Amino acid sequence: MTSSKIEMPGEVKADPAALMASLHLLPSPTPNLEIKYTKIFINNEWQNSESGRVFPVYNPATGEQVCEVQEADKADIDKAVQAARLAFSLGSVWRRMDASERGRLLDKLADLVERDRAVLATMESLNGGKPFLQAFYVDLQGVIKTFRYYAGWADKIHGMTIPVDGDYFTFTRHEPIGVCGQIIPWNFPLLMFAWKIAPALCCGNTVVIKPAEQTPLSALYMGALIKEAGFPPGVINILPGYGPTAGAAIASHIGIDKIAFTGSTEVGKLIQEAAGRSNLKRVTLELGGKSPNIIFADADLDYAVEQAHQGVFFNQGQCCTAGSRIFVEESIYEEFVRRSVERAKRRVVGSPFDPTTEQGPQIDKKQYNKILELIQSGVAEGAKLECGGKGLGRKGFFIEPTVFSNVTDDMRIAKEEIFGPVQEILRFKTMDEVIERANNSDFGLVAAVFTNDINKALTVSSAMQAGTVWINCYNALNAQSPFGGFKMSGNGREMGEFGLREYSEVKTVTVKIPQKNS
């Protein structure tokens, strides 16, 4: 094959002096943030749980309690489903609303998120531990773009006429499915909230959504904005609670027509089983990953090192897309490892509210312990620990940026999703070899390849068993493009036009006519 060079975006290198000089231009966290919304949101009203139970919410940077939130269980889910079914009933305000008006409401919601962007970013940092500037510029930007993207789609979803045989007039309608149950994770609480509700509302559905018990605060705040935007009562209902109670009630509820879940593969299996046992509700699952990132010797090495670093360590490594299996061609392996270790050692770990922080804490003690246990397994199985590997001796759940070399495919750290700041670097010799090894996984969410040869890039991308493949980039997610997994990384697609298919049913209508004319 003839080599054809691919143009890559230039690497951005931060000037520390320039950064410090420009800090006054950056957005600031909201000081003394008041947590106003801690109750269940049903029918546009704030309510206590039927049981009267509450649960604590923590700041992972300190381990200290922030507040208590009402704990929803099956009784509360029943109330929410009843409200959502009423809002979806024929002749309701929501069902009779013009599609363009649904779009206007989503646009209004985006406006309100923009207005309260600093408050919401502060909440994501306080409750989730992510750096404030990441929350402000990445998470909140994604939320706003998602709402605006689907606002534009609302009055552009339509069927078609079909020239069937005989004296008939046949057309299709794209109708909302009904009441959608949605369960979202703790790693991107607000972004996943938007990913779930925006396409559902765009298509005219109603929603019962459960945020993760670790991070309910931003979702509850959105309840106030939803009401302010003018959504009718019962259209969106927000219920904080635990998976085995509130989550299980959503998955098995016969009054829910569709369920969408983002989280672990293990829980995804349980949800699909519950959906089948109850009313065979429609299911969309966005699950775990163990994504390969393939670096060829002809790649721009500095650029590839930085992209691979961000692809693993972004969001404290708490990404389903994390490129944790980094396959590096043998001739550049040692140099790639050396530069990756240097970069990991420069990574700034600290308070989420410090503008120089790149990495905050893990979400909770359970995840912290799981990550450290997997790191120890890597050492025990013979991988070389190049740097990191320990928790930091401070309050909160901080872990050092960790890099392993000499990793082999049979090690636990090469097979299991770590969901933490741990980079595993493997070596390969040939393209055929690396394709086979990269695909040798139960997961198939994303993959990436770095090379200046377009033929290599397209050969690898077409061979990868993954829902998304990035060439000379990583984590390039957009509201306009579909996202979802192969194999045990899930089913269905979110985002883009394809995301609308998950929230609509196609109905065929045929009319007998006296005479058909072409």
Curated annotation (Swiss-Prot):
One GO term of the biological process aspect: midgut development
Effect of residue 182 to K: In DIH4; decreased retinoic acid biosynthetic process
Molecular function terms, GO-annotated: 3-chloroallyl aldehyde dehydrogenase activity; aldehyde dehydrogenase (NAD+) activity; retinal binding; retinal dehydrogenase activity
Pathway in which this enzyme or protein is active: Cofactor metabolism; retinol metabolism
EC class: oxidoreductase
Pfam families, alphabetized: Aldedh
Enzyme Commission designation: 1.2.1.36
Annotated localization: Cytoplasm
InterPro entries: Ald_DH/histidinol_DH, Ald_DH_C, Ald_DH_CS_CYS, Ald_DH_CS_GLU, Ald_DH_N, Aldehyde_DH_dom
Binding of NAD(+), residues: 184-186, 210-213, 264-266, 366-370, 417
Record-marked site positions (Transition state stabilizer): 187
Domain of life, per lineage: Eukaryota
SUPFAM superfamilies: ALDH-like
PANTHER family: ALDEHYDE DEHYDROGENASE-RELATED
Assembly behavior: Homotetramer.
Protein family (similarity comment): Belongs to the aldehyde dehydrogenase family.
Disease field: Diaphragmatic hernia 4, with cardiovascular defects: An autosomal recessive form of congenital diaphragmatic hernia, a posterolateral defect of the diaphragm, generally located on the left side, that permits the herniation of abdominal viscera into the thorax. The lungs are hypoplastic and have abnormal vessels that cause respiratory insufficiency and persistent pulmonary hypertension with high mortality. About one third of cases have cardiovascular malformations and lesser proportions have skeletal, neural, genitourinary, gastrointestinal or other defects.
Protein name from the UniProt record: Retinal dehydrogenase 2
Organism whose genome encodes this protein: Homo sapiens (Human)
Name of the gene: ALDH1A2
